[in-house]
């Protein structure tokens, strides 16, 4: 929120609920986008569309990657059960230890500033890019991330899920388009995307 407020102070205008239908180009250069609220002219378009980044790239004539959904589920514990470990605790799966290309490093335990303990996330491939449903299987996985003997599944107060924009190369895509001038790819951003955000913004 603080970053968004800072951006607003520095002249950024946020347009929420504007769905992009096409990317406008002329002579191989971006000129703007067509949205369901009209045309927005722009000399640059930064494609940070998450799970739909490949669709936007296709509109700009430069789709060289395919995004597939990978759902992650996180369980929130009751803050009445104070975590025994006040810091981040991560675990690595046996497959990751063996150097195999796995969908998840393993998840972990994440205490919030309010001392709610977060467990997870899981990593499940899903065909629907907007599948934010939660399942018992995913909840069971998040509980395997628990290393705190004082915390049990009875302490879960909420479960939520989101879909990561995974690329088949399992790496971030942050680069200028080689085919369409003014078009910038910021795609396939997974973990540690939040921690990387300032560096990604600086590079872009």
Segments from the language model and where they lie:
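Conserved positions in beta-strands of structured domains
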Residues: 21-24, 157
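A conserved beta-strand/loop element that lines the FAD pocket in flavoprotein oxidoreductases
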Residues: 10-20
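C-terminal catalytic lobe of FAD-dependent flavoproteins
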Residues: 2, 104, 113-114, 125, ...
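A short alpha-helix-loop-beta-strand transition element characteristic
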Residues: 13, 63-67, 152-155
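Alpha-helix N-cap/helix-start capping motif
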Residues: 18, 50-51, 198
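Rossmann-like flavin
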Residues: 1-11
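General beta-strand structural signal in soluble alpha/beta enzymes
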Residues: 14-16, 35, 47, 119, ...
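Flavin-dependent oxidoreductases
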Residues: 23-29, 34-133, 144
